[in-house]
């Protein structure tokens, strides 16, 4: 038998399943549809079994996983929809366009729920700067994100950028979007009866992005030139017009449901609507507005051209929808209808070019229970004893850490984004979480005094060292960040970036990370309402397989009772500084930036998260914010305590005086990244009340210093002065190091 299935990304076993169901050989177009919809990117065939472990329900959850975005209640007037998604493979091939279309795609996911997009965030991973392509990739990706986000008028308010060798030839570009919905006005990818029409609105259809879903479900080789046509090209100006047109259509209640056109194009969107509606669908491909000549049915069905949406419309509303499309200078045409059988049919100029059971395309996509086993490297990385590390000079170590691209200021990145467009951003990038007000310009009666907070986190290094504990570590940090600004965590969305699931060692990383994340979500009472899985993040380079660190990215959304009542991460007034949280756990350097930068090691085990104490700390921080008992709060994370303290005073008028007494080694105390620890600023007249509240909650506190009016830093450790300098030289290192690495200064 000719191995025809391989060209469509199918396995022989999958092809035999298709033959058995159809009782005939599928044609070229049908194979294209099945190859795209059965790809890992669309079907989640390796991960679906394990994703069921996540908690997804809560009284404030309106829509959990299974739709284009999750939806949660903010109050009786406002809901929010949000999701994070990857665009990793396209961003390596074409950094600018890959990243830009990643932003466009996630905006349309949220838009398809009937939500107006109001905020973006991104989580980026690149190789280190000794790799010649890193500068090009960073500049291209950041330019692509800023181009699309700035032009479409949605602020990029949060994110993170990390550099590790494992991402050298496989960068990770994860984009998040959040939108607001009037309560009760949510849409789904659904039809309600046969005879309803499918209306394609937006840009015209070209050949860009064909095979995009299949490409995103395979490993890379060094030669990516041949894959460039698989990368979609986005147009944010067209995207902006599409947003406004959809908002007008929704406001006038002219549609039944909608679905954006993303992976697998029209074939994917139409079959998903049919499957979720338990109906069939007919498509008339000659009606699709085209931008290129001589496109064949295969190309029309599977094109992933951007800025397109598929609307379910009653026949009597078609002309009204067309008028709105014309008003916004968008293409618009009826391209199909809903039928009462379980069949996907595509016609081209009267000829039937594809006929498949909807259930086969969507519901019967294979689900694999892949084998998994602990990788051999685990024995090597666990062989670590921090007591054997040589003592280092704290001052020199601090300077090296401030120069690390993982710690140095990311202003070069986020100042390219317009994070204030829309004038709703109250707490800008550089804090533990962004804070936004929920303001409706056109519908002031829907404005609420509540605010939302957004935080994005990932720690591939920790997950690599212990996927189970690392999964807990990441979820806990996101929730802690939200609480630091005073927000109650409501829900998370995740993007699970892993290597090839056909390798048992990679599948073990995935399974254990999901289990750890699920446990943290259960214990902290945080549902997972949406997400994305990105597998096959590996590169074959000179016959050597290079896998990325297992990298679950978690974006959390929280609510503040009053938008303007938040806690900043920066010092805004003179304060005493206290470390609060779980201070009884032995401090460890395992997996820390200090261990990597100063000692060249990625070793150890993940410092465990005490989820019970984490939950107490989260509630305590929210209480402190509501009672206005603290002046600032910042969690101890990458770089450790001393880095966190400096981050709180950099870009402020204040200096820092650190004074600690402990039995720990100086390097362990200052650079450990143990979780469940937060630095808070307290005015002296409120210190006793705060300390009493910490003790009453069952947590620990430690006085670690104070801010000063003089812009200096002084660190004393058990009575010995370790450093005493002008703060400016440390701040300059932190502020300029990344720009210098990028050749921008």
Swiss-Prot record:
Positions contributing to ATP binding: 44, 83, 494, 531
Keyword match Flavoprotein: no
SUPFAM superfamilies referenced in this protein's UniProt entry, alphabetically: PurM C-terminal domain-like (SSF56042), PurM N-terminal domain-like (SSF55326)
GO molecular function annotation: ATP binding; magnesium ion binding; phosphoribosylformylglycinamidine synthase activity
Positions annotated as active site in the UniProt record: 41, 87 (proton acceptor)
Annotated transmembrane regions: none
A cellular component annotation (GO) from this entry: cytoplasm
UniProt-annotated binding residues for Mg(2+) 2: 109, 260
Enzyme superclass (EC): ligase
GO biological process, any: 'de novo' IMP biosynthetic process
Localization (cell): Cytoplasm
Alphabetical UniProt keywords: ATP-binding, Cytoplasm, Ligase, Magnesium, Metal-binding, Nucleotide-binding, Purine biosynthesis
Pathway annotation: Purine metabolism; IMP biosynthesis via de novo pathway; 5-amino-1-(5-phospho-D-ribosyl)imidazole from N(2)-formyl-N(1)-(5-phospho-D-ribosyl)glycinamide: step 1/2
EC number: 6.3.5.3
CDD domains the UniProt entry points to: PurL_repeat1 (cd02203), PurL_repeat2 (cd02204)
Reactions accelerated catalytically: N(2)-formyl-N(1)-(5-phospho-beta-D-ribosyl)glycinamide + L-glutamine + ATP + H2O = 2-formamido-N(1)-(5-O-phospho-beta-D-ribosyl)acetamidine + L-glutamate + ADP + phosphate + H(+)
Pfam families: AIRS, AIRS_C, FGAR-AT_linker
Positions with a binding annotation for Mg(2+) 1: 85, 532
Binding-site residues for substrate, renumbered to this chain: 86-89, 108, 232, 304-306, 534
Main location: cytoplasm
UniProt-listed NCBIfam families: FGAM_synth_II (TIGR01736), PRK01213.1 (NF002290)
Homology family: Belongs to the FGAMS family.
Its biological purpose: Part of the phosphoribosylformylglycinamidine synthase complex involved in the purines biosynthetic pathway. Catalyzes the ATP-dependent conversion of formylglycinamide ribonucleotide (FGAR) and glutamine to yield formylglycinamidine ribonucleotide (FGAM) and glutamate. The FGAM synthase complex is composed of three subunits. PurQ produces an ammonia molecule by converting glutamine to glutamate. PurL transfers the ammonia molecule to FGAR to form FGAM in an ATP-dependent manner.
Subunit details: Monomer. Part of the FGAM synthase complex composed of 1 PurL, 1 PurQ and 2 PurS subunits.
Protein name (Swiss-Prot/TrEMBL): Phosphoribosylformylglycinamidine synthase subunit PurL
Organism: Aquifex aeolicus (strain VF5)
Gene transcribed to yield this protein: purL
